[in-house]
């Protein structure tokens, strides 16, 4: 009898251990840990870095949608859907109902979704942004994997003193969707970070964007800021990794508006995501950064795309309506790299940068 009880006890213990190990293995690895507090309660959620590895969407606010979209179509963005007049009945601004209507166009460059928005009625965040800063990309959106992740990240940022600016929700054939803009722009270099909870964003893009070269993939995002170190410190304090490096940049072969350039800047690089972020603090001008700052203040400056033959692409894009505005090069172990800004800023407040990097 004792041997029977002992055997059963071993089997029960083994089963319990197996269930515990299985539960541990099945736990999602991207979910931040929740440490129990002294009173046995669950601690507040932490920052989930996996969410911010990829930019899913940019919200690009403009005053003349048709003019801007037609221009970028000429440059090669053809994966475009004209959504028409869109209602946002559930929109709120800083906790107050702010129902809006806006003209909207959705486009894709690679796996990046672009929402061009021209506010018509309501939408205080969009209309105030236009009045204060002009046209431009105002928001970068990051997709969560579940409604719980969405709520947890909002709780986390709230615990760090970051409030919600805009909230919206909707229902479509894919399910219930939500978006929340966080109040990061004032200290974060004009970057409004948004969380998106929408079932269709949980899936990979079904087809690549059918755009013309070189507008087939965005290879970096860039902002003009007043103090790159303060921006770095702000995001580090929120729990993001510090910038990979901050360099005093004095490029070779500098050209600005067809004349020899003397511009210098601090460049901060954040390479923690799948697409690098560049933060530019202007030191010596004139240059396109000074132009941008005078017109828009701090904020999103350019989208970068890679090219294989710089001179050929400059000819191509000039013919499409985007001549060069600034040009510079640098040395690499495999030859000279080169970066050329195109004069697209008058059409939507965003500059397009061509990058040739032989590495």
Task: Locate predicted features.
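Bacterial N-terminal signal peptides that target proteins for export
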Residues: 2-12
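A structural feature that tracks compact, well-ordered secondary-structure segments
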Residues: 59, 71, 117-119, 195-198, ...
């Amino acid at each position: 009898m004792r041997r029977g009880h002992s055997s059963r006890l071993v089997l029960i213990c083994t089963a319990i251990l197996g269930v515990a190990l299985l539960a541990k293995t099945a736990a999602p690895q991207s979910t931040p840990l929740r440490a129990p507090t002294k009173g046995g309660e669950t601690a507040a959620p932490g920052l989930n870095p996996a969410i911010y590895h990829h930019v899913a969407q940019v919200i690009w606010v403009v005053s003349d949608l048709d003019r801007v979209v037609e221009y970028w179509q000429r440059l090669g963005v053809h994966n475009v859907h004209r959504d028409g007049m869109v209602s946002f009945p559930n929109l709120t601004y800083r906790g107050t109902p702010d129902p809006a209507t806006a003209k909207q166009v959705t486009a894709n460059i690679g796996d990046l979704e672009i929402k061009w928005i021209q506010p018509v009625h309501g939408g205080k965040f969009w209309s105030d942004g236009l009045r204060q800063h002009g046209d431009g990309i105002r928001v970068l959106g990051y997709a969560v994997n579940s409604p719980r992740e969405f709520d947890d990240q909002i709780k986390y940022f709230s615990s760090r003193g970051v409030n919600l600016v805009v909230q919206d929700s909707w229902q479509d054939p894919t399910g219930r969707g939500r978006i929340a803009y966080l109040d990061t722009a004032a200290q974060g270099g004009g970057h409004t970070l948004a969380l998106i909870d929408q079932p269709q964003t949980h899936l990979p893009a079904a087809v690549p964007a059918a755009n013309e070269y070189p507008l087939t993939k965005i290879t970096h995002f860039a902002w003009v800021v007043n103090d790159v170190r303060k921006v770095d410190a702000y995001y580090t304090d929120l729990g993001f990794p510090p910038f990979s490096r901050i360099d005093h940049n004095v490029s070779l072969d500098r050209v600005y508006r067809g004349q020899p350039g003397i511009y210098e800047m601090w460049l901060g690089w954040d390479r923690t995501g799948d697409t690098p972020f560049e933060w530019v603090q202007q030191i010596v001008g004139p240059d396109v950064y000074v132009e941008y700052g005078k017109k828009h203040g701090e904020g999103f400056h350019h989208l970068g795309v890679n090219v294989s033959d710089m001179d050929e692409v400059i000819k191509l894009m000039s013919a499409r309506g985007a001549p060069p505005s600034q040009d510079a090069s640098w040395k690499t172990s495999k030859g000279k790299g080169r970066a050329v800004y195109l004069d697209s800023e008058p059409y939507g407040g965003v500059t397009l940068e061509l990058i040739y990097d032989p590495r």
